Amino acid sequence: MFCNILGKIFTISCFGESHGKVIGCIIGGCPSNIKLSNIDVQIEVNKRKPGISKYITSRKENDKIKILSGIFNKKTTGAPIAIIIKNNDKKSRDYDNIKNIFRPGHADYTYWNKYKNIDFRGGGHSSGRLTANIVSASSITKKYLFKNYGIVFKGYVKQIGKNKILFESWDLINFKLNIANIKKKNIIKKYIKYINKIGDSCGANINLIIKNLPIGIGNPIFDKLNSRISYYLMNINAIKAINIGNGIKGIKYKGSKFNDIITKKGFKTNNSGGILGGISTGQDIKISIFIKPTSSIKIPQKSINKFNKKVKFIIKGRHDTCIGIRILSVAESMLSLVIMDFILNFNSYKI
């Protein structure tokens, strides 16, 4: 049995497959009277949809969303909200030659051993395509959190492959590469083109920031803010590691340098990434995520099939050379979901 529900108060349940008729989500625990239209949801979904840049997958999906329930007079009612997205640009025949093969880096091997019946087309239910549902739900959470608390979620690609990309300005970020350095633009473009030309893929490092989060969000022992953030983010395909604040860099520091000194005006530094004892400090929440190279590559690979026979194969189809570019919008969305869940729980203490 699949576990498809995320969240405690504000919940999301996802359904669908990469090459099925539709993908969709059911959102529960949403407060009433939030203004919400198809356009609000579409704006967010467009940030991650395929086919908008030559540097990502060429699969062209309109990703046109449709809200089925939970809205009346252009506002949320408090009832479950159902949103669907049709799958239009499917090429299932690209997977016929590998339907019995366990692709390295994919979920085929584990899914088959657990369920014995999997949809091999584009990864089926395990496909990153279902992250469009996460982004759909974030249209509600981002809007609610900004309007009521001024909370903002930002991010940028810090590294692609071996290429480190220094941050220059938020104004430089666009959806094609999601980098914040205009000087590195052409270098990154050439690098991705080269990796794509040789049929391989590359990983990425992304920095994420949550701004204006109030003090007191999170819990002291279990259900810490940092543990829930990590849990939500690790539910995104391809993310293999997470760093909060200067957690990794900090192993080189002495305690006298790592400790964030507190003054009457606030903290002098933010090595802890805005979280102490599992609870937000009021500073920016700083997170870094590490994305593995895309598993689907066009280079010949070796594996075994369902019959335990050795095989050599090539993956066809259309895939991202660097999935990290599109994961940015999904990661920002995931952060908004976990913060929404915490905020609603936090407010319940005031009743």
Curated annotation (Swiss-Prot):
The protein's Enzyme Commission number: 4.2.3.5
Record keyword Lipid biosynthesis present: no
Binding site for NADP(+): 48
Keywords for the protein's UniProt record, in alphabetical order: Amino-acid biosynthesis, Aromatic amino acid biosynthesis, FAD, Flavoprotein, FMN, Lyase, NADP
Top-level lineage group: Bacteria
Reaction equation(s) it catalyzes: 5-O-(1-carboxyvinyl)-3-phosphoshikimate = chorismate + phosphate
Stored SUPFAM superfamilies: Chorismate synthase, AroC
Cofactor requirement: FMNH2
Cofactor: how bound: Reduced FMN (FMNH(2)).
Binding-site residues, FMN: 125-127, 237-238, 277, 292-296, 318
Sample GO molecular function, one term: FMN binding
Gene3D superfamilies linked to this entry: Chorismate synthase AroC
Annotated Gene Ontology cellular component terms: cytosol
Biochemical pathway: Metabolic intermediate biosynthesis; chorismate biosynthesis; chorismate from D-erythrose 4-phosphate and phosphoenolpyruvate: step 7/7
UniProt cross-references to InterPro entries, sorted A to Z: Chorismate_synth, Chorismate_synth_AroC_sf
Function: This reaction introduces a second double bond into the aromatic ring system.
Protein name: Chorismate synthase
Organism: Zinderia insecticola (strain CARI)
